[in-house]
Swiss-Prot record:
Domain (KH type-2): residue spans on this chain: 207-284
Coiled-coil parts of chain: none
Lineage: Bacteria, Pseudomonadati, Pseudomonadota, Gammaproteobacteria, Enterobacterales
Name this polypeptide is given: GTPase Era
Alphabetical keyword list: Cell inner membrane, Cell membrane, Cytoplasm, GTP-binding, Membrane, Nucleotide-binding, Ribosome biogenesis, RNA-binding, rRNA-binding
Length: 303
């Protein structure tokens, strides 16, 4: 009888300030998209686990909301708590920074990381966007002095550059353990949650600078239909009447584009036909009300 093959499994937190490319890195590490991305900061509002199983190795990545100093609204406070609490009980932290930029928010993150017992890997993202390459090496030396990093790796998550190096380091730091999830799992989140995230991503991509932080999505219906697909009803909540008009657009043009793009992404993710209907409703003050936020699925606890 052959010896049982050893398996390795571990949790890896991906942290950093808003808009440094954490979700793009997660998607690249997984080889497919599960965490929404946009060029706007704070696209990620929830912690999302991405699961990558390859042979005996299962890496469970935790993509976190961006840590930031500003906590003016209840939603910002919850997002900060969600990101901070992800740092407990992980085997490794990947700290993502952006090119040659270093901000007060980066400083705040590194201050939190210094007290951790687990190793911290520094990923310098978007190095392909650094126009003056002579600044890169001195900046890497500056970053190396901030704390005792396990390693410092320059990457481009968007282009996949050196992401395999990150994955290799992750595998080396995984403890011997049974896998937590079946090998075909790519996330711990439900299809209903992923549907709401896909709609929110399209809202952020197609609407103006201000609106996305006053908008959230609630899935009111997610049911299989007789054709082997899904009927999905999404409720888009905004804070003001003017925002509702912005989401709907002239003669419904904007919400039609958002709905079409979201449906196509859902069909790719769920590998089934989707019938999607969207509504827009005004619910003033939702982003300042912790009780309302929790009812909409915003929480600082892992689900």
């Amino acid at each position: 009888m052959s010896e049982v093959e050893k398996t390795y499994c571990g949790f890896i937190a991906i942290v950093g300030r808003p808009n440094v490319g954490k979700s793009t890195l997660l998607n690249e590490l997984l080889g497919q998209k599960i965490s929404i991305t946009s060029r706007k900061p704070q696209t990620t509002r929830h912690r999302i686990m991405g699961i990558h199983t390859e042979g005996p190795y299962q890496a469970i990545y935790v993509d976190t909301p961006g840590l930031h100093i500003e906590e003016k609204r209840a939603i910002n406070r919850l997002m900060n708590r969600a990101a901070s609490s992800s740092l407990g009980d992980v085997e490794l932290v990947i700290f993502v920074v952006e090119g040659t930029h270093w901000t007060a928010d980066d400083e705040m993150v590194v201050n939190k990381l210094r007290s951790l017992q687990c190793p911290v890997l520094l990923a310098i993202n978007k190095v392909d966007n650094v126009t003056d390459k002579t600044k890169l090496l001195p900046h890497m030396q500056f970053l190396s002095q901030q704390m005792n990093f396990l390693d410092v790796v320059p990457i481009s998550a968007e282009k996949g550059m050196n992401v395999d190096t990150i994955a290799s380091i992750v595998r080396k730091h995984m403890p011997e353990a049974e896998h937590h999830f079946p090998e075909d799992y790519i996330t711990d989140r439900s299809q209903r949650f992923m549907a709401s995230e896909i709609i929110r991503e399209k809202l952020m991509r197609f609407l103006g600078e201000e609106l996305p932080y006053s908008v959230t999505v609630e899935i009111e219906q997610f049911v299989p239909n007789e054709r082997g697909g899904y009927n999905i009803h999404g409720l888009i909540l905004v804070e003001r009447e003017g925002q509702k008009k912005m989401v709907i657009g002239n003669k419904g043009s904007k919400i039609k584009v958002i709905g079409t793009e979201a449906r196509q992404d859902m069909e790719r993710m769920f590998e089934a036909k989707v019938h999607l209907e969207l509504w827009v409703k005004v619910k003033s003050g939702w982003a300042d009300d912790e009780r309302a936020l929790r009812s909409l699925g915003y929480t600082d606890d892992l689900k």
